[in-house]
Amino acid sequence: MSNKVIFNLDELFISVGIDVGADFSWMSIALPNQQFVGKPYKILHNSIDSLTTAVSKIKEAEELYSLESRIFLESTGIYHYPLFCYLRDKGFNCSVINPIITKNSTNINIRKVHIMIVLILKKLLWLV
């Protein structure tokens, strides 16, 4: 039996992984083939310019690759809630992931996930 994963083109999406902290979050954007779009972006929670730039980066990737995005925020206490609401109010498909799930899906001992969170979440959602 083959271990190949076959994707339905109607189900492809851009994955946006956000590692949420108290004062700032790290955002990474990945394509369905697990290639990253640009560098991780630091979102400052108290800066409207930073929040606007994050939204612009997501929309730019959606337009460039003609795919919708799905945003996955790692739940960190209550710190994820304002960012979740902001992005949802901007029209994005957002989900909050329990950090225990993301930490249990890898054997890599990393305190902060940053870039890896996108790949971990994609594996959880697509069972790659």
Name each model feature, range by range.
Residues 1-128:
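Phosphate- and other anionic-substrate recognition elements at nucleic-acid/protein interfaces
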